[in-house]
Amino acid sequence: MTIQKNWQELIRPNKLQVTPGSDPSRFATLVAEPLERGFGQTLGNALRRVLLSSLQGAAVQSVHIDGVLHEFSSIAGVREDVTDIVLNIKDISIKMQGEGPKRMVIKKQGPGVVTAGDIQTVGDVVVLNPELQLCTLDDGAEIRMEFTVDTGKGYVAADRNRPEDAPIGLIPVDSLFSPVRKVSYKVENTREGQILDYDKLTLTIETNGAITPEDALAYSARILQDQLNVFVNFEEPRKEVVQEIIPDLAFNPAFLKKVDELELSVRSANCLKNDNIVYIGDLVQKSEAEMLRTPNFGRKSLNEIKEVLAQMGLHLGMEVPGWPPENIDELAKRFEDHY
């Protein structure tokens, strides 16, 4: 037995379906199927942990407010105390292209609400939630705040954001660098051909807009791939590539696909099997009337088969010159990557 059989004979997902949410830059549902039994839970849990903890992002690390010495202060003419303002600052979502740290400033006079959209940013820093309210100024009040922004991963507590040489009045802020806000997953049964006990993994991802859910998942998978490489203690033998000569066919290569590979109901599949219909080429030559004469084959099964064939650009009652070929089994193997 070759070692490659350990992974080559496992079924792998043949598609990743992405369904965008109301805001495609922030919300999406991603479905991978089919997976070997148990792999849905294994991959779902691992990807969720990496998505929430390991992706790079940007966040506010500290703030300096003019006239404020510490976070337990209050500011004349500002309705919120400094503690509440700092809590609001934690929720600022930022996208930063270059390397940090960077400085951002707010300077505003009352009356009115101070929002994240009032921040004066540098060129490669973007505030993603400008509607976020930071504080409220009364008539005649004024506030000036200077933020330090940097990149990182995961969650960093405020005490770790305080430099050793921090000046008086610098207030460190808890930093949530991760661009991913929420991740949930579920595992369901799915079918492949006539086998019903494969896994379907569904991931629902919400980001802050700095990265799309699809890219976040791709980066997380790459992180896992990189971390697992250390456990592979062998090199695979290189397979010599031989250029195969593919013969010309007088018919569509899709006709060489077996009907048991179609996603049909058990009833429809059994009816085809009992009527000795093995390949799609056998099936498309049948008329609707011939199919309805098959024992236990009704209108519901007929409509199901017509729908599956239509998705392939085929239909019942087709003429297939040269069918069946003498070497049909050999041709089916040679053309399995062409339909």
UniProtKB/Swiss-Prot annotation:
GO biological process: DNA-templated transcription
CDD domains (alphabetical): RNAP_alpha_NTD
Region (Alpha C-terminal domain (alpha-CTD)): 251-339
Enzyme class: transferase
Enzyme Commission code: 2.7.7.6
Keywords from the UniProt entry: DNA-directed RNA polymerase, Nucleotidyltransferase, Transcription, Transferase
GO cellular component: cytoplasm; DNA-directed RNA polymerase complex
Pfam families: RNA_pol_A_bac, RNA_pol_A_CTD, RNA_pol_L
Gene Ontology MF terms in the entry: DNA binding; DNA-directed RNA polymerase activity; protein dimerization activity
Region (Alpha N-terminal domain (alpha-NTD)): 1-235
Gene3D superfamilies cross-referenced by the UniProt entry: 5' to 3' exonuclease, C-terminal subdomain, DNA-directed RNA polymerase, insert domain, RNA polymerase, RBP11-like subunit
Reaction(s) this enzyme catalyzes, per UniProt: RNA(n) + a ribonucleoside 5'-triphosphate = RNA(n+1) + diphosphate
Record text about domains: The N-terminal domain is essential for RNAP assembly and basal transcription, whereas the C-terminal domain is involved in interaction with transcriptional regulators and with upstream promoter elements.
Function: DNA-dependent RNA polymerase catalyzes the transcription of DNA into RNA using the four ribonucleoside triphosphates as substrates.
Entry similarity comment: Belongs to the RNA polymerase alpha chain family.
Complex formation: Homodimer. The RNAP catalytic core consists of 2 alpha, 1 beta, 1 beta' and 1 omega subunit. When a sigma factor is associated with the core the holoenzyme is formed, which can initiate transcription.
UniProt protein name: DNA-directed RNA polymerase subunit alpha
Source organism of this protein record: Afipia carboxidovorans (strain ATCC 49405 / DSM 1227 / KCTC 32145 / OM5)
This protein's encoding gene: rpoA
